[in-house]
Structure formats: structure tokens, C-alpha cells
Amino acid sequence: MTTTTRADCPTCKTQQQVNKDGTIRKHTPAGNAIPCPGSGVPVGTARIPRRSTAGFYKCHVTGQLLRSVTTILNQGSPKEALIHWAGRLVAETAMEHLPQLVRASRHPDTAKEMTDWLKRAHTRKKEERGDLGTTVHALIEAKVLDTPVPDAIANDPELRPYVANFEQFVADWQITFTASEMVVADYEHKFAGTLDYLLRSPLLAAELGCPADMEIPGDTKTGGELDSRTYDGNVHGVYPEAGVQMSAYRKAKYGWLRDGTRVEMPPRHEVGVVLHLRPEGYRLYPVRCGDDVFEAFTFIRRVAEFQTGPAKNIVGQALTLKRSQAREVA
């Protein structure tokens, strides 16, 4: 037996069927010759903008295409730390598999295969970390929303330390979450993204110098190592870009609730926190995300726009000297 979802058309206010994509089915009101303008309008959770593969969110309220914050940062901000990390990872992988490398080097075909395998070491590691990070974020969201966690995830021994340390963080700092995995947007600067969470904490408020009821932006990072520093002094796994990303989410004026309702965002503190969550424990870092950091985000956006637009037309075709011109010069 199947059930058909129905909802009120926002235009004609009549009950209509809802398509699988969350839009009102095409319908024509009684006495009209043309379909109702409400046909095809998204309702419920379908009103929440989703990130496309091209890196844009489409707002169903205004029809605007809003560039993804992460896309902007990926295209406009250098990743120097990743270059060093990738080089170190390939070197470590080679040393761990030295006997196989020696054997493979004796034949051209196997040597090429091993070279290609080494070149992809950083990709494999990123995918592995990405899967872990996604799963941990799903666990955190379930904890925040007090919803059931699938047994396959909850009983995974690799994830149990993360859950325990996250719960310890919540207890230690008396955390109350007010939003999680929320899509936010700013029409003036034409961007959108999904923030990790907003929280309140009397202990954090005292540390950061803000009212106890102030919303504090938060993010979780699962990579790197606790208390480890990179060659340039950054925390291994928590980078300045986290504050830049957070500054954009803080600047966003609108957000979408889980039922699809668009709301104005409340004031958020100019200092957020990044939870560095690892199996061996956690660290909580204050991260600046005020207007001065957001200004840096606007510069990064301009670089991203250059890289995806004008940069493609900077270098022209190679010039060739015509024979007649060559003879005249001679």
C-alpha cells in the first residue's frame, strides 16, 4: 500500500499532491484555463537549498544561485600545508613498502604501476579521512538532535572513542546546541553553506567575553594529531581557514530550519570554537571569525572568481612569425 503526500499550495491554498522531488504537482484551479502558479513550487524540506555538483546553492525564495563557501575557499585559498602533507605521506608510504618498490623497479610495467600507486597515496588518505569525518559528523548531529544512530555506526569500535570524547566535551563545557548542519545564505555577498553548529555555554561565554545567551559558532575537525604543530606553527588539523569559513557563516543573514522554513539568523559572537576531536581526546580552540576575518573571505572570493573566469583568458595562443615579415626584417 502506498501513501501520497499532500500539502497546501502556497498560491491557491488548496490541498495538492506533492511530487517526489518535494514540489507541488501541476494543477489547475476550478474555473481557470491555465495552471496555478504554485505548480512546481517546493514545499517542506524541499525548500532548503542543496549544494549542486557545480558548487552552487539555489535559493527557492529568490531564485538566486549562491556560490558555496567551501567552493570559494577551495578555488581561492592556497593549500600550502596540503602540499607538504602530500609529499611527506608519499615518502612515508614508499618507506613502508620498500621491498615491494625494489621488486617493482625491476620491470617497466610494474614500476609504472607502483609509481601511479604512490602518486595516489594522498588521495586514498583523504578519502579515508573524509569517510571518517563524515561519519563522525553524522554521529555528532545525531547526538545534537537526540535522534537514533544506526547500530552499524554506533557499534563501530573505531568510532566509540570519538563519541565518548564528544560527550565529554559537551559535559565539560555545559554545551547546549541551538542549530546543527544548518544551511545559511547571504544574498548581498551571494554565498551559501552548511554550518556545523551553533551553541551556547556559560563557561565558554565567560572565556570568550560574550553574554551567556549569545550564539557561538562551532566546528569540528577530526584530522591531524592532538597538540601537534605544522612546520609553520599551525595546529595540525585546525587551520586558520576554519576561521575564514566560520566568518562567512557568521555573516549569513538567513538560515533554513529543518522543516524548510527560512528564518533570519540571530547575532553570533565574533569568536567561535573549533573542536579538535580525536580518539585519544579533544582540544577546544577559540577561532576569530569577526568582520576583519570576513574581509579576508571577500578577497579570497575575488581570487576564486578570477581563477574560474578571467584567468582562463590571460594567456593567449603562441605567436608565429609570418614568412613575409621574417623576410622584411632580414
Question: Which residues does each predicted region cover?
Answer:
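Short metal-coordination and nucleic-acid-contact micro-motifs, chiefly zinc-binding Cys/His arrays
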Residues: 3-5, 29-32, 249
